Structures are given as structure tokens and as C-alpha cells.
Amino acid sequence: MNIHNEIAADPQTALDHFEKLLSLETDCWDVHAALASGAPGFVLLDVRSPQAFEGGHVPGSLHLPHGRINERNLAAYRPDTLFVVYCSGPHCNGADRAAARLARLGRKVKKMIGGAEGWKVEGFALEKGAEVPRDSVASVSGLVSPIQGHP
């Protein structure tokens, strides 16, 4: 069987599928444009290990490994805050794990497809180094405060 012989989805099924994907995912270009606007309306979370974050992360992202996503670490954020999560790239399921945890906690979430690798492939620079101290972290959305209990 090849693509010409396979039955394609009807247009409504395709529309439903792709609209659902767009409600769950965003891409590096959209995140970059939103961050550049100065008022993205979301909190960008790098959910990788501390070493990966220090090695290079999306500017403006906060570090919260997917295993540390819990109500206590989200308590400072308004319930309607949108979180955009990313991990290393398509070979990593950390963003999926983070998104599932956030959704389980009743939080709005999207995954940035491509992750840190996709960010680089699109030609955007990663920032190196450890996260800035908690008391100087500026909210990327202007609506939230730093993660409580986060080193």
C-alpha cells in the first residue's frame, strides 16, 4: 500500500485532528514571536535536567524539571496561567510528561514542538548558564511570580 492507495481521512476528521493538535502544541517560531512581543501571555518551562538547562535553554524560560511539577511548585501561579513546556527535542518525552502532570493538576498547557533542538534548528540562540536567583526572576507573562521552593 502507498499513499495514493490509502484512504485519506474525510475533511471534517482532518480538521478535528489538526485543530486538536493546535490546541495542544505550539512551535518555536510562535514562542519566539510571543517572547519578542514582550507580553507572551504564558510561562515557558524548561523541564529538562539542571545540567541540560545550564548547557543551553530558551531565553526567558524558567527551569522546572518535569518530575518536580506539583501543586506546591505551581502555587504562586494563577489558576488560568498557560504553561508552555519543552524538553530536548523530538527524541525526548519530558515535555509530554510535564504536560500530562500540568493537565492532571488542572493547569492549561501546550508543548513547544521541537524543544531546545528545534529552537537551535530554527536559528534562535540558546542562553547558557544557571537560572537567575528566584528573587530576580521576572515573569515572562507579567501575570505570575517565580516558582516556590525552586532552587
Residue ranges and their predicted role:
Residues 1-44, 48-55, 129-151:
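Flexible, polar/low-complexity N-terminal or interdomain linker segments that lie immediately upstream
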Residues 53-59, 119:
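Short loop/helix-cap segments at secondary-structure boundaries that form the rim of catalytic
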Residues 62, 80, 126-130:
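Short, hinge-like loop/turn segments at secondary-structure boundaries
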Residues 66, 115, 132:
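Residue-level "edge-of-site" marker
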Residues 74-120:
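Catalytic cysteine-centered active loop of the rhodanese-like fold, especially the PTP/DSP P-loop
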